[in-house]
């Protein structure tokens, strides 16, 4: 079974993930992922949990705004081998997601992740 770490910021944007969280988790579960879910509590929380648990999963998915995504990537940069990264935009502007064409509707973004849609990836060197 594939393992996923799902990190989300419940305060991002207008807290819109709260109404869609169960649908998102259902999409991942039905796709065969063993989920570990982490709700961010404070600044740098996403970075710390990804740095600590990222090596134990096949994919890290974060949901929040550009700040949550930045923290998630910062945590991944501390890993020797990076898992795949998925992003479900839930912030107020979502500039990064818009620039890559990631769907703004959260369930659609979740489906893209499980279907293996790929966008330009981070280089392994971090540069």
Residues covered by each model-derived region:
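ATP/NTP phosphate-donor binding region
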Residues: 1-63, 74-75, 108
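Catalytic core of DAGKc-family lipid kinases
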Residues: 5, 31, 78-127
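Generic detector of intrinsically disordered, low-complexity, polar/charged segments
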Residues: 10, 61-64, 72, 83, ...
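Phosphate- and divalent-cation-binding pockets in alpha/beta enzyme and binding domains
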Residues: 48, 71-72, 95-96
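Short, basic, helix/turn surface patches
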Residues: 61-68, 115-120
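Short Gly/Thr/Asp-enriched flexible loops that form oxyanion-binding sites at enzyme active sites
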Residues: 68-80
């Amino acid at each position: 079974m594939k393992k996923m770490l799902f990190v989300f910021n419940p305060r991002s944007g207008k807290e819109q993930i709260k109404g869609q969280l169960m649908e998102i988790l259902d999409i991942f579960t039905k796709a065969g992922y063993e989920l570990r879910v982490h709700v961010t509590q404070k600044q740098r929380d996403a970075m710390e949990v990804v740095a600590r648990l990222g090596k134990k999963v096949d994919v890290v998915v974060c949901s929040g705004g550009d700040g949550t995504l930045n923290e998630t990537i910062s945590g991944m940069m501390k890993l020797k081998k990076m898992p795949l990264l998925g992003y479900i935009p839930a912030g107020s502007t979502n500039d990064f997601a818009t620039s890559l064409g990631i769907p703004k509707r959260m369930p659609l973004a979740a489906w893209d992740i499980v279907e293996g849609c790929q966008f330009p990836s981070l280089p392994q060197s971090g540069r």
